[in-house]
Amino acid sequence: MLNGAQALVKMLENHGVTHVFGIPGAKVDSLFIALLDSPIELVLCRHEQNAVFMDQAFGRLTGKVGVCVVTSGPGVTNLVTGLVTATSEGDPVLAIGGEVPLDDRIKRTHQALDGVDVMKPVTKYAQSALTIHSLPEVFGNAVRAAESGRPGAVFLGLPKDVGLADFPGEISPLWGRSAPCGPAASSELQRAALLINAARRPLVLMGLQASQPASADAIKRFLAATGLPYAATFQGPGGWAAASQYAGKLGLFRNQPADRLLDDADCVITVGFDPIEFDPSLWNSGKSRPLVAIDGQAIDQDQAFLPQVELIGDLDASLEALAPLLQVQVEEAFRRSADAEAAELAATVAEGAQLGGMPVHPLRVVHELQQVVTPDTTVALDVGSHYIWMSRYFATGHARQVLVSNGQQTLGVALPWAMAANLLRPDQPVISVSGDGGFLFTATELETAKRLGSRFVHLIWNSASYDMVEFQEQAHYGRIAGVKLGHYDVEAFAAAFGCKGYRINDADQLGPVLREALQADCPVLIDIPIDYSDNLKLMQNVHQDFIH
């Protein structure tokens, strides 16, 4: 007979889980032992938060839950930042947290904690399996919540004695299976078509859920069939979906070419858009134009985001059903404007090839990366000034080729995401990018990466500061505080973990070093002294209210 921990592992196997990330402890040792007899690979991490970041990348790249296991008390509380990041950014994650035995739940005892109450604000679902009979129910409902609608993180609490109790009966493969949805209601599709067909300057605004790999073909077909111009948030689909209709990325400071097009649009069709990516008050306040929202669940209403029509259902099916109903006559001037915005973006990117000297200009780094990134390369971005330059100017080749934290803007995600991408796609290149500040948030996982035999290249844009905060403080207050950092030796740091490190001393080194690093059989760190003197240009023509 299986015990609770063994039964839970079997449920994970039935759901197709291939990796579990975590850190052991007495309350979950039964689960760790059960994994010894499972084909699921156990990845021992250096911090629980980083385990969730790795799960988040698994969820984002596969659409299925990433799974982590941690012990009670501080093991559970260390999950919070990772879980709120996953929930905010639509990534399915299942966190399993150990708990004290049932008889100790009401006592003031070692590592006693109501993990469910801690987790409720940062997850879609949080529940403890308080009996062995309820374990499959809690598991099934948790996984369904994580993967359905707008995906996110969930928490399953496992008391120690429930993990050790005998599990009665068979384990159905139906636990956790999600029910497929159909397209939006026919009547709403007709209403949406009337609004869109009446527009002369319509713009599609693609959000994070539109960039799911499973939706890529449906997005391409919709854009090809309708000919509509589109823009995207930092996490939305890039030019790969329909290059000739793509106006570029928008968000954060509302001063990009695509933002001008969004301002001029007389109808906005949002697809998989989440207000956390780009606050509607920054782009739709005071506008009387119609909005059509296409999503997997009802949108969060906002004073500046009250769509006249919501198409709620399976995103792909709704797009397929809507496309034949659209006969849009796009104003030629608006279409030319979209082309002009795209050309302006391309011209800015082209400047990068000509920028030499030291420190290295951000556009030169973007240019050199563009030369080595292949269609099967995954690029993981941390948060900082580099993420603005990369998100605006780096061209993506397919859905979720570039991973970015645009909801919570959580520091430290890039390195764990790169590790997860390499585990999922061991034969494909992986490049991650961070600042010198964000890198040290999760740099301990370099030991994990070396132990796993990971291969990826991590670029550190080094400014010895929290630069994204610095230039915003300078713009807002005319002076700075709490942003300057000390230097550290990246090459020596890499060597300490048995990895390889480089320091760029001339911009012309960067291309050859990148090519050499991508051939290495271990993790590689590249230290790039960066010239952020043009950062204030990122905020030109920006109202002060747009400075976050």
Predicted regions and their residues:
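N-terminal alpha/beta PP-like core and its mobile active-site loop of ThDP/TPP-dependent enzymes
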Residues: M1-E332, E368, V372-P375, R455-H458, ...
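Active-site diphosphate/adenylate-binding microenvironment
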Residues: A5-L8, A26, L31-F32, E341-P416, ...
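Active-site nucleophile and cofactor-binding loops and adjacent substrate-binding regions
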Residues: I23-G25, V43-F53, C68-G75, L130-T131, ...
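Short acidic loop-to-helix transition motifs that present clustered carboxylates
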Residues: V28, E48-F53, I276, H386-I388, ...
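Well-ordered beta-strand positions enriched in small/hydrophobic/aromatic, beta-favoring residues
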Residues: G66-C68, L156, V379, V402, ...
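Thiamine diphosphate
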Residues: I96, R105-Q111, A216, D302-A304, ...
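Glycine- and charged-residue-rich phosphate/anionic-cofactor binding loop of Rossmann-like
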Residues: Q127-L130, G352, Y502
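Phosphate/pyrophosphate-binding active-site segments
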Residues: H133, G169-I171, K287-Y387, A507, ...
